[in-house]
């Protein structure tokens, strides 16, 4: 029914005629219009009582069986029909739908193999913790199947799209217009100076505008911010937003567009980063702690240019570590992977202090495991120093890290500890190779980069294979990740086998797209937009980019799974 084309926790899909979802549904389910679905299968339902609405309810209840009231006692659920199955013709195709009618007893749901799932009690679920059944449904069904949640308010759409809903309706536009309410992006406002038609047209327009914004947000990677903007005005939405634990495979490892950090510190992109940060191995036993900067990557900011120059003047190889919220700790080697904006007040929350100190303690534990002796130099402003829970540190910042006095102090201090690195085989060339290897470890879960490599000014990485210099990867200037070449993909496959991002196929592939008929298996931990290798009978064939997570690929029935970039001849 749908073909996913972009993910940002929520998903952007296209129908067969190229129309994009999330959108207002225009499918005539069981011969009922949107209005009839609202007043029919949605009943009993809390909405304003009036004779006209009662008559609509009574006349539209035509589904085969009695709908289970939301708060039905569990002992009485057996007398109600919990699922309605049928088919519907849409744009020349016949689709199977399932109306899910389980009341508050979400554990009773039994999913059929369908193209469209209709949440009969969505209006009640959205105000309760049971709303989390929707992502659980999404987890079990094909990515080509759609979820429809009837009778939602416009400001509920971003959250519902975020957790996996594809179709909505604007049935509440007419109902609330008839009661004198004007919809805005965030609420319904009682007004007296508008006619029913004016209110109705306005309310319908708000639905369309919200849906358009959601589609744009998914495509450009800022859906979470749209969700927060609308959810924060409604406690029930905010509660369900905070409850939801999204599948991190449905976001890319690094985004080209800036992540906007608001009040919610537990954002998916940060969680994904922190999970992989644990695998980072430090290179030097001289650790220099630095503050973050508003400009990203940090190294192009004026302040970090000064820090880098001061460190270079000391002619000492150090491990530069940036302390920041919400990422906690960012080694210089990984700085291009974090691109964010956060409001700076000069004050830290308890959660931020705890995160930074935990990250730092874990990092220093690894330093100690690798090197018996090490030193931590804090070149930080006062409001950073106040939160550090470290005993043995050398402070060089003298109040203002960018002042000439502080920068000279940093250089002189580093010179004093130069002897620490002499017996450790630490040098600048080795650090550059180490940084690429740690990037590979972070991105692929394995270091497949040889110790003998050459990196040119374009970020292209070469090594000798069969006595020939061959490019194995390049650094993507937009997101800081590695882009594989054929040689690099084969090296990755030979290094990690099926522990890495592999896609198994059943035919001799060509450049283009991989579709489900040619798909055999994959690593289900592949994330959307990941670099992948393609194999057949354990033989390397080519490289590409994942268009959905590996978990979703295994359930897909149609649509492109992988963009095949290059194939071994």
UniProtKB/Swiss-Prot annotation:
SMART domains registered for this protein in UniProt: PUA (SM00359)
The keyword Transferase belongs to this UniProt entry's keyword annotation: yes
Location of the PUA domain: 495-569
EC number: 2.6.1.97
Gene Ontology annotations of biological process type: archaeosine-tRNA biosynthetic process; tRNA modification; tRNA wobble guanine modification
Keyword tRNA processing attached: yes
SUPFAM superfamilies reported for this sequence: Pre-PUA domain, PUA domain-like, tRNA-guanine transglycosylase, Uracil-DNA glycosylase-like
Biological or metabolic pathway of the protein: tRNA modification; archaeosine-tRNA biosynthesis
InterPro entries xref list: Archaeosine_synthase_1, ArchSynthase1/Queuine_TRR, DUF5591, PUA, PUA-like_sf, PUA_sf, TGT-like_sf, Uncharacterised_CHP00451
Catalytic activity: 7-cyano-7-carbaguanosine(15) in tRNA + L-glutamine + H2O = archaeosine(15) in tRNA + L-glutamate
Keywords in alphabetical order: Transferase, tRNA processing
Sequence similarity: Belongs to the archaeosine synthase type 1 family.
NCBIfam families per record: tRNA_mod_ArcS (NF040592), unchar_dom_2 (TIGR00451)
Protein name in UniProt: Archaeosine synthase
């Amino acid at each position: 029914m749908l073909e996913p084309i972009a993910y940002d926790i929520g998903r952007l899909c296209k129908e067969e005629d190229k129309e994009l979802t999330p959108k207002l549904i225009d499918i005539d389910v069981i011969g009922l219009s949107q209005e009839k679905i609202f007043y029919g299968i949605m009943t009993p339902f809390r909405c304003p009582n009036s004779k006209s609405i009662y008559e609509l309810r009574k006349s539209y209840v035509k589904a085969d069986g009695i709908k289970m009231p939301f708060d039905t006692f569990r002992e009485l659920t057996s007398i109600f029909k919990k699922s309605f199955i049928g088919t519907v013709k849409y744009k020349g195709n016949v689709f199977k739908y399932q109306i899910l009618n389980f009341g508050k007893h979400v554990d009773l749901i039994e999913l059929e193999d369908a193209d469209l799932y209709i949440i009969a009690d969505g209006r009640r679920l959205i105000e309760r913790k049971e709303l989390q059944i929707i992502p659980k449904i999404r987890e079990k069904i094909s990515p080509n199947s759609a979820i429809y949640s009837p009778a939602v308010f416009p400001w509920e759409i971003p959250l519902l799209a975020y957790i996996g809903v594809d179709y909505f309706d604007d049935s509440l536009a007419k109902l609330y217009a008839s009661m004198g309410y004007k919809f805005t992006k965030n609420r319904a406002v009682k007004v007296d100076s508008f006619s029913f038609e004016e209110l109705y047209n306005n309310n319908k327009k708000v639905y369309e505008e919200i849906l358009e914004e959601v589609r744009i947000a998914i495509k450009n990677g800022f859906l979470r911010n749209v969700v927060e903007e609308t959810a924060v005005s409604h406690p029930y939405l905010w509660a369900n937003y905070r409850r939801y634990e999204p599948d991190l495979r449905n976001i890319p490892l690094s985004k080209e567009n800036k992540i906007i950090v608001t009040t919610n510190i537990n954002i998916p992109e940060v969680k994904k980063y922190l999970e992989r940060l644990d695998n980072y191995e430090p290179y030097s036993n001289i650790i220099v702690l630095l503050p973050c900067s508003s400009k990203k990557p940090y190294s192009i900011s004026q302040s970090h240019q000064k820090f880098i120059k001061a460190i270079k003047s000391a002619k000492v190889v150090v491990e530069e570590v940036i302390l920041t919220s919400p990422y906690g700790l960012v080694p210089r080697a990984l700085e291009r992977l974090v691109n964010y904006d956060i409001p700076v007040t000069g004050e830290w929350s308890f959660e931020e202090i705890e995160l930074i100190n935990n990250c730092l303690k874990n990092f220093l534990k690894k330093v100690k495991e690798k090197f018996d002796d090490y030193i931590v130099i804090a070149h930080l402003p006062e409001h950073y120093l106040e939160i550090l829970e470290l005993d043995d540190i050398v402070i060089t910042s003298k109040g203002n890290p960018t002042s000439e006095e502080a920068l000279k102090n940093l250089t002189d201090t580093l010179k004093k500890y130069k002897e620490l690195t002499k017996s450790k085989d630490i040098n600048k060339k080795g650090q550059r190779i180490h940084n690429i290897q740690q990037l590979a470890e972070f991105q692929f879960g394995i270091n497949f980069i040889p110790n003998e490599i050459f990196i040119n000014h374009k970020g292209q990485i070469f090594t000798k294979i069969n006595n020939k210099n061959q490019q194995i990867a390049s650094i993507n200037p937009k997101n800081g990740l590695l882009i594989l070449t054929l040689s690099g993909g084969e090296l990755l496959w030979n290094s990690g086998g099926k522990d890495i991002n592999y896609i198994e196929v059943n035919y001799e592939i060509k450049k283009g797209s991989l579709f489900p008929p040619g798909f055999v298996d994959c690593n289900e931990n592949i994330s959307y937009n990941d670099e992948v290798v393609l194999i057949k009978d354990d033989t390397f064939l080519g490289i590409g980019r994942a268009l959905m997570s590996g978990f979703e690929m295994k359930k897909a029935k149609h649509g492109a799974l992988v963009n095949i970039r290059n194939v071994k001849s």
